Structure formats: structure tokens, C-alpha cells
A protein has these predicted regions:
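Short alpha-helical transmembrane interface motifs in multi-pass membrane proteins
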Residues: 1, 37-39, 72-78, 102-106, ...
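Small-residue-rich hydrophobic transmembrane alpha-helices
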Residues: 1-47, 85-103
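Hydrophobic alpha-helical elements at and bordering transmembrane segments
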Residues: 28, 32, 71, 75, ...
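Residue-level recognition of transmembrane alpha-helices
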Residues: 39, 75-78, 82, 100, ...
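Membrane-embedded alpha-helical segments of multi-pass transporters/permeases
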Residues: 44-55, 60, 77, 116, ...
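Alpha-helical transmembrane segments of multi-pass membrane proteins
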Residues: 49, 65-91
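Membrane-interface helix-loop junctions in multi-pass transport and translocation proteins
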Residues: 112-146
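Interhelical loop/hinge segments that connect adjacent transmembrane helices in multipass membrane
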Residues: 137, 149-183
Length: 183
């Protein structure tokens, strides 16, 4: 489901790169908050619609009752990672647009390590089976999101003084954001 919203990363990186090239620190700041905000809004919608999304998936894909039960367990745990994952798409695109591809790489490596360690621990030490794998994934998603926030706060905190909340959701700017991401 998440990669449907990959435009958050791709469009954000292009627009941020343009603002970076123009040395427009205000627009750079707005783009981060806009992309993360849109990601969090979409995640909220996914959380609200999780039941019909899962039912639609099982309508489209025929499975055995056992697979459906396991997939349901996994889905209902992992869906709570939507805010972290979609928010991280915004951060990753923004970091790349800021000519910093190392931070997304560090975050991805950290997420993978956390996911492996947590999933193995939950499955083999706590015998949580598929719920353990899902919980490990969920923890890794939030570890990546919080790492992105910490990296932003540590290395880009000077941009926080440029935040003007009403400019983030300007109608014309939001239209441009979605227009770029649509194409």
C-alpha cells in the first residue's frame, strides 16, 4: 500500500532540489513540512480506512483461511506504521533534495538492523510468530522516522526559525505540490 504514495519522496526531492539550487531557505522549510504533513494526513486516512482496505484486498486476492488470518494479524499491526513510513517518505525526499543522500541511507540501514533484531527477538525469544515479525517491522518504521527527526533537528535546526505555518498549506502551493507529484 505504501509505495502508492512514493510520490511523497520523489516529488519532494525534485522540488526541494530546485529550492536548494535557488537558495530559497523558506521554500526548503515549507517543502519539508508540506510533504511530511501530507504523508501524515494520508496515514491518518489509511488508519481510519484500515478495515475496508483489508476487506478489499481479500476480495481481490483469494487466500486460504489460514493465510487470511496471518495476513490480517500482520496488516492490523503494520498499518500503525503508516504515519512513520509516509512521514519518512517526506523526510527522505527532502534530504535527497538537500543534496544529502547519506541520511536516507543511514536511516534505511538502521531500520533494517532494528527490523531484523526486533523481529528475530519477538519470533524466537517471545514466540510471537507473525505478530512478532509485524511488531518488529512497526518498531523499525518508527525508529527510522524518529531518526529522521533527530537528524533534522541536529543538522538543520536553523531552518526551524523560518517556519510560517500558514504558508505551508497555501492553496496554490499545495496545488503545485500535488501537480508535480501527479505527473
Amino acid at each position: 500500500i505504501y509505495w502508492i504514495f512514493g510520490f511523497l519522496r520523489m516529488g519532494t526531492s525534485g522540488m526541494t532540489s530546485q529550492a536548494y539550487g535557488q537558495h530559497d531557505l523558506n521554500e526548503i522549510t515549507r517543502l519539508l513540512l508540506r510533504s511530511v504533513g501530507v504523508g501524515l494526513f494520508i496515514a491518518l486516512c489509511l488508519l481510519i480506512l484500515q478495515y475496508p482496505i483489508l476487506k478489499l484486498a481479500f476480495t481481490l486476492i483469494q487466500t486460504t483461511p489460514e493465510v487470511e488470518q496471518l495476513a490480517t494479524t500482520y496488516f492490523y499491526i503494520c498499518i500503525w506504521g503508516a504515519p512513520a513510513t509516509l512521514g519518512l517518505y517526506g523526510f527522505a525526499g527532502w534530504f535527497i533534495g538537500m543534496q544529502n543522500s547519506r541520511f536516507p541511507m543511514y536511516i534505511a540501514i538502521t531500520q533494517n538492523i532494528v527490523n531484523i533484531v526486533a523481529s528475530l527477538s519477538f519470533v524466537y525469544l517471545l514466540d510471537m510468530k507473525v505478530a512478532g515479525v509485524a511488531t518488529g517491522t512497526l518498531i523499525a518504521q518508527y525508529a527510522g522516522f524518529f531518526m529522521a527527526i533527530l537528524l533534522y533537528m541536529r543538522y538543520y535546526s536553523a531552518l526551524r526559525k523560518r517556519i510560517v505555518w500558514k504558508e505551508i498549506i497555501q492553496k496554490q502551493a499545495m496545488y503545485r505540490f500535488f501537480q508535480v507529484n501527479r505527473d
